[in-house]
Amino acid sequence: MAYLESAVVIYLRAMYGIENLLRDINFQPDAYTFIEIGREAATIIMLVTLSLISGNNWSKKIGYFFLSFGIWDIFYYIWLYVCIQWPKSLFEWDVLFLIPLPWWGPVIAPILVSVVLIFIGLLLIYDFKFKISSFDWIIFCLSIFMILYTFMDDSIKILLSGNGSLTEVRPTNFNWIIFLLSIIVWVVVTLKVSIPSIKQRGKSQN
């Protein structure tokens, strides 16, 4: 799936003559724009379907989704680099998604998210029981929300201000402080709720 994703993006770059995303990309809606949005939705549906048939309970189904999404996203960039030697840098800007708004971020940002998703996915797949409180859930969900916000920050600002069009969105800067703090909180909460189960699993095996 990662190779197919990268192949489609390579074709789109060639078709639109895109060498520099910030300079060359055109978000003016056309038939291909809606096809691309449909392709993004279809990719998520495929990952969800794979997860639903892989896990024998909801915890594992979610785990397989996190795992497959993380691996897919990382190998998407690996295949892009193998095929067209892009990105030149892990800090190069990329359009991550168009649903529900255009997402922008340095390449390393979604890769970091994918690494965390793989870690959480493995914990769920191997049936570690999370002892999570309501407060932990709130902090966990808030950290995810803030990560998503950093990706859609510019799109949200244009949408709320009413000045300009989403088709004109170009990233101005990436809020590394909010992003990294959210990643750290996400990891800390995950460790906090999973370490007791990991320790218990270790004791039972000794």
Predicted regions and their residues:
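Membrane-interface loop-to-helix entry segments
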Residues: F27-T49, L98-F119, P171-L180
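Hydrophobic core of alpha-helical transmembrane segments in multi-pass integral membrane proteins
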Residues: I44-L50, L112-L124, F140-S155, W176-V193
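Juxtamembrane "helix-exit" motif on the non-cytosolic side of transmembrane helices
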Residues: Q85-W86, I125-D127, M152-G164
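Membrane-interface capping segments at transmembrane-helix boundaries
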Residues: I125-K131, V189-Q205
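Perimembrane loop-to-helix junctions flanking transmembrane segments
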Residues: Y16-Y32
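Transmembrane alpha-helix/helix-exit interface in multi-pass inner-membrane proteins
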Residues: A2-R13, G70-S89
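Membrane-interface interhelical connector segments
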Residues: L21, V82-L101
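Interfacial segments of alpha-helical transmembrane regions
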Residues: G55-I71, K131-L142
